[in-house]
Amino acid sequence: MFMNRWLFSTNHKDIGTLYLLFGAWAGMVGTGLSLLIRAELGQPGTLIGDDQVYNVLVTAHAFVMIFFMVMPIMIGGFGNWLVPLMIGAPDMAFPRMNNMSFWLLPPSFLLLMASSMIEAGAGTGWTVYPPLAGNLAHAGASVDLTIFSLHLAGVSSILGAINFITTIINMKPPAMTQYQTPLFVWSVLVTAVLLLLSLPVLAAGITMLLTDRNLNTTFFDPAGGGDPILYQHLFWFFGHPEVYILILPGFGMISHIVTYYSGKKEPFGYMGMIWAMVSIGFLGFIVWAHHMFTVGMDVDTRAYFTSATMIIAIPTGVKVFSWLATLHGGNIKWSPALMWALGFIFLFTVGGLTGIVLANSSLDIVLHDTYYVVAHFHYVLSMGAVFAIMGGFVHWFPLFSGYTLNTTWAKIHFLIMFVGVNLTFFPQHFLGLSGMPRRYSDYPDAYTTWNTISSMGSFISLTAVMLMIFIIWEAFTSKREVLAVDLTYTNLEWLNGCPPPYHTFEEPAFVNPKWS
C-alpha cells in the first residue's frame, strides 16, 4: 500500500507533496553549503584552506538551490498541487510521466553529490565554462558526473513542462477559456514553455562539453578549430530564460496572495498581468549575451543587449504596479502570507534596480564577476523566489495539510528571515562597488567589515530556517483544523475542502462563467 501510494503514485497531490518534501530537504543541503561559504568568508584568512574545495561548495550550492530546491518546489510542488485544482481537472494530463519527472530528481541529486565527493570535485562554478571544465583543468570524473546530473534534471523538467502545457491547454472544462484561468496557471504555462525551449540548448552544450572531455572532439577547443565562447552562448541561451523560470511561478503565487489578503475578488489588470508574463518570457530569450559583456563583443552587439535587457523592466514594472493597485483600497488582512508578498514586492524591485544598473554594458565591464552581481541575483532569488515560496507555503499550507499554522510564530519567522537575508546581501553591493571579485575564498583586509556583517546575516537566516521547521512541526502536532475559507471566483482551489479529497473530480467539473 505504502509503495503503491508513494513510489508508483499517479496522483497529482501526492506527487506534489513528494516534490515539496524533496525540495525542502534539498533546500537544507543548499543552505548548509551557503553557510560553509559564508563561514569561510566571515573573516580574512582561510578556514577550509583549499580553493578547489571552496569552488566545489559554490558550484554545488548553486546547482542544489536552483535545480533541487526552487524548481521542484515552485513548479513540481505548487504546480502539481494547484494547477489541476485551479482549472477543475481531475489530475495532470500524463499522470505516470508526472511520477517519472519526480523520480528522475533523486538520482540526479545523487550524481551531483557524488561529483563533489570523488576526485577533486567540480569547482567550475554553475556555468561550467571550458577550458576550466575541460579534461585538463578538471581531470577525473567529477565534471562528467555533474553533466549527467544536469541531463537527468533537464529531462525531468522537459517532461514536466510537456505535462503542464498539455494539462493547461487541454484539460480545462469546456466552458472555461484560457483567459478565465487564474494567474498562477498562466505563470506555470509560460514557465513550462520557457523550459521546453531552453533546456534542449543546455543539453546540447553540456553534451558537446562531455564529448570534448572524453571523445577528443574540439567543439570548445581552439586547437581544433573550436571556440570556448560558443559554449558561453549556448549556456546563457539556457541560463537567462532559466532565471525567469525560477521567478515566474513566484509572480503567479504573489498575484494570488495579494488578491486574497486585499479582500479583492480579482487581481488588478488581469490581462495586463498575462501580457507582462508572456512578454517577460519572450524577452528572456533575446538578452542572453548581457552575461558576456566582458568577452569582447562588438559595440553594436553590446548596445543591442543593453537596450533589450532594459526593455524587460517595462513588463516587470507592469506587474509590480498591478500588485500595488490590487492592494490599493483593499480591506487588507495582515497575515504572514501577505507579509511575505509585500517583502517580495519591495525586495524583488530592489534586485530589479541593480539589474538595470548591470544591464549597462559599460558599467558591467567594471562590475562583472564582483559581489555586486552576487548581491543582485540573490536579491531576486533569495528574496524574490524564496519569499514567494514561503508566502505560497504559509498561504496554501492549510489546503495541503488541513491544519493551520500558528500565525504569531509565522510572523516572527518572517521578521527574522527578513533581517537575515538583508543583512547578508545588502553589504555585498558595497563589496562589489569596491571591486571584491566573486568565487575567491580569501580577500584583502579592506573588505573585512562588510564580509563579517554579511556572514552574521547568514547565521540569522539559519535561525529562521530552524524556526520554520519548528513551526511546521507545531502545526502538525497541534492539529488546528481549517474553519472557513474566503471563496471568490479566483480562489477555486479551496472549493473542495481542506485538504481536498484524494480524487478531486469524479466527473467533469461544471463551470458557469459570469462572461463567456
UniProtKB/Swiss-Prot annotation:
Name its cellular compartments. Mitochondrion inner membrane
What is the protein's name according to its record?
A: Cytochrome c oxidase subunit 1
**Family membership:** Belongs to the heme-copper respiratory oxidase family.
Query: Which species does this protein come from?
Result: Balaenoptera musculus
- Cite the CDD domains for this sequence: Cyt_c_Oxidase_I
Superkingdom to which the source organism belongs = Eukaryota
Keywords of this entry? Calcium, Copper, Electron transport, Heme, Iron, Magnesium, Membrane, Metal-binding, Mitochondrion, Mitochondrion inner membrane, Respiratory chain, Sodium, Translocase, Transmembrane, Transmembrane helix, Transport
Q: How does it assemble?
A: Component of the cytochrome c oxidase (complex IV, CIV), a multisubunit enzyme composed of 14 subunits. The complex is composed of a catalytic core of 3 subunits MT-CO1, MT-CO2 and MT-CO3, encoded in the mitochondrial DNA, and 11 supernumerary subunits COX4I, COX5A, COX5B, COX6A, COX6B, COX6C, COX7A, COX7B, COX7C, COX8 and NDUFA4, which are encoded in the nuclear genome.
Q: What does this protein do?
A: Component of the cytochrome c oxidase, the last enzyme in the mitochondrial electron transport chain which drives oxidative phosphorylation. The respiratory chain contains 3 multisubunit complexes succinate dehydrogenase (complex II, CII), ubiquinol-cytochrome c oxidoreductase (cytochrome b-c1 complex, complex III, CIII) and cytochrome c oxidase (complex IV, CIV), that cooperate to transfer electrons derived from NADH and succinate to molecular oxygen, creating an electrochemical gradient over the inner membrane that drives transmembrane transport and the ATP synthase.
Pathway-wise, it operates in: Energy metabolism; oxidative phosphorylation
Q: Which Pfam families match?
A: COX1
Keyword Membrane: yes or no?
yes
Residues that bind heme a3, according to the entry?
A: 376
Which enzyme type, at the first EC level?
translocase
How does the UniProt record describe the way this protein sits in the membrane? Multi-pass membrane protein
